[in-house]
Amino acid sequence: MTIEQQIVATAIAAVKELYGQDVPEKMVQLQKTRSEFEGNLTLVVFPFLKISHKKPEDTAQDLGQYIKANSQAIADYNVVKGFLNLVIDKKAWLGLLNEMNANEKFGEKPVTENSPLVMIEYSSPNTNKPLHLGHVRNNLLGWSLAQIMEANGNKVVKTNIVNDRGIHICKSMLAWLKYGNGETPETSGKKGDHLIGDYYVAFDKHYREEVKTLKAQYMAEGMDEEAAEKKAKEESPLIKEAHEMLVKWEQNDPEVRALWKKMNDWVYAGFDETYKALGVGFDKIYYESNTYLVGKKKVEEGLAKGLFFRKDDNSVWADLTDEGLDQKLLLRSDGTSVYMTQDIGTAEMRFNDFPIDKMIYVVGNEQNYHFQVLSILLDRLGFKWGKELVHFSYGMVELPNGKMKSREGTVVDADDLIAAMIGDAKQTSEELGKFKDMTEEERNEIARIVGLGALKYFILKVDARKNMLFNPEESIDFNGNTGPFIQYTYARIRSILRKAQAEGIAVPAQLGENMPLNEKEIELIQKLNEFGAAVEQAGKDYSPSGIANYCYELTKAFNQFYHDYSILGADTEDEKIVRLVLAQNVGKTLKNGMALLGIEVPERM
């Protein structure tokens, strides 16, 4: 039982004993005591006034006397207006530190056989181009959210839906047939996703040229500019061929399907490299080429049950006007599906594969309305988690102007960004002398850890709902609210512990109850103890930024302590041992906290 749990239980017993009434746990509000007052935790008395029928100060005195007399964790108390400030006994702090020291995952809840199953969808790439900066934010948020939900005692399934069909894929395929001369990732020396992305760009280039030529021709024939452009886009031989290829794909044409599979396989190999470099992955991958058929079938079942309706043109719709929304198209008049149909199909396949209790979609905020509708439709179709599905909505991420422009000058490839971050981390680390006495292999590994840590932390520390500007230079600063600052602090702690070991100092598993503790050491234990609450809150709010903020606050607290107090040069052996145990647990908590963000920490720097 934690110190907070002990106090809550004793406070509930106090109200029962003193005022003869049972109160729920949520009525007992504990908060950290403000720095200008004596104490460690403060009990808010106001919720009990209707029960005590006394003044706030008198109620606080009653509760304070009872809690001090009945809880070994409390050394003393004082009352400030309606607030009861509790001074935690030094032995209780040492006991808490021992508890932390004995638990490698202190602050996290274990996953059990009966834990609820949470499925998290993220990434959702198209197979006609490489992953870009927007995908980076999506993948980092999804991966971190999965770690946080697991740390809150949930079983987690990480999933990806790949948009592997449609006109955009056919454009890349057609361009490769026309202009590729049999080029492959091996012959070109390019990753498969980059190669296919180049052919998507090539299609667009040739298509624009065709439209320009046709538009000029139609205008010369007397057509106005707007009508000429519209007709040119429709009559372009390239776009017609792409649509013909899509029809053949849907008809299972063997040649088209073989080409589609070959080119998609190149892309998947490229994606896998990017995911590996980014340190993310999935437990189950779904493909739109499978799910859209399931979605069509599910919509037709809903139609037969009267959940949806068919219009005169044969299209199928859902009427959501009773929910304050509009009518939603589910199948076009020619029977082809829309994105909503595919999402219904994907949901059906997942529901059949896993006993899902909660479904979280990590998708940009431009899709807010889509998921509002999907939630209603899934609920009507009988998915138990439909009504409660979570759309983890996030904002756009951009780079400062002139930073890392891509070949098209608009979108930054994830691979280019990762390589640039690792390169910048290596250069900055060399300039700051962080690579002293390291081999080239060790330098490259530290650069990888720091570069990716800088990228991930800078993105994840921002509230996901907000648009953000990612500044590569700011992210690699070894001071301030950055990944490298936290990583360097962890490496410093590991260095201290190695020096202690070299001096023959053994860090004990348990501290005796009479070991010395000063106020600053108690503050550090209290900050360590807040990790569990930070993990729980991050799980409730779906907020990786809450974990990032906690790691930064703990890092600042340790660095201030280390500035004020020597660890290995402490005045007494007992002080040295206590501080080494403290440092060890700060390091462990930083490592665990950063792992929830998908960030590695280096053992040395």
State the predicted function of each range:
Residues A102-E113:
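Flexible, low-complexity linker/hinge segments
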